[in-house]
Amino acid sequence: MAKSKLEYIWLDGYKPTANLRGKTKIVEDFSGKLEDCPMWAFDGSSTRQAEGGSSDCLLKPVALYPDPVRRDGWIVMTEVLNPDGSPHESNGRATIDDDDDDFWFGFEQEYFLWDTDTNLPLGFPKDQTPQGQFYCSVGGANAFGREIMDRHLDICIDAGINIEGTNAEVAAGQWEFQCFAKGAAKAGDEIWVARYFLERLAEEYGIKIEYHPKPLGATDWNGSGMHANFSNSILRTCGSKETYEKICESFRPVVQEHIEVYGAYNDQRLTGDHETQSINEFSYGVSDRGASIRIPIMTVEKGYKGWLEDRRPASNGDPYKIAARII
C-alpha cells in the first residue's frame, strides 16, 4: 500500500501574533481529495489554545495542496475547533462572511530575510548606504537572498498556489510576493500556506523570516506591509466614481476596528512616512501610496470598474481576520 505524508498545519493561540504549527499524519492509499482528509486533534495546552486539564483541540481540514518538497507529501490547511466542534476563539477563518466567494483578494506579502548572526537583514549595508537602490534590483551589491525567493516561488507554483509575482523591496534583504484568489477564505489559505513554505525554506538556510512591520525601528528604512487588494461585484462592475468614494468613506468611522486586526506593532510602521498614512488618520486617493486606501489607476482607466487597495495591513497580520474585517 502506498503511504502519503499529510502535514496538518494550523494557527496557534499566541498573542498578539499567531504562529504556524504543523504535524504529520501518515495515510495509506490517500486519494488526494480534501474530503478524504480525516479530522485530527492536538494538544492545545502547548499552543496556548487550551488548559492542561482539557487540552484537546480539533483540526478541521479546509484546504489541500500538494507538497513539492516532500516525497508523497501534502499540506492540509486546517481550522482549529473546540472539542464540541465550535470554532476556537483563535480561528479567524471561521469569522469570514463570504459564502458566495463574491469578494476577491490579492495580498502583497512583504518580509525580510533575517540574518540570525548579525540580527540584521541579509546584506544590510555596513556603510550606511541609504535605501533606494534595492527596490526591484539586480546584482550582488543590491539583491540579497534571491535564491531563497526563487525557490519559494517555484515551490508555490508547483503546489498550485496562485502566486502572481515577486520582487525585491525597498530595503536591503526585503522581498515581496503576491497571491490572488476568488474568495476571501481561499485568499487567506494561499497566504498561510505560502508562508509555511517560506518558513520551511528558512530552516534550510539557517535564517529567520521576519514579518515584524518595522524590524529596523525608527530609522529611515521602510517597514513591511501586506497590502490588501480587494473587490466585490459592485466594485468590479459599478462604473461610478461616486460609488467608489462612498465605499471608501464607509471605512472612515471604523478605522480603529480595522487597525485592531491589521497586525501588531503597526503603529511603528504607519507613521505617515515611507509610503504610509498615519495610523491616526484616514485618507484615500487615486494612485496615492501615502493614503490609507489607494484607488489604483487601472481601476480609474477602466471607468471605475476594478478594485481598491487597503495599504494599512501589516506584514504580520492574519489574512483571514483582515479579509473578514474588510468584508
Question: What are the language-model segments listed below?
Answer:
Residues M1-I327:
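Glycine-rich, acidic/polar active-site loops that bind/position phosphate-bearing ligands
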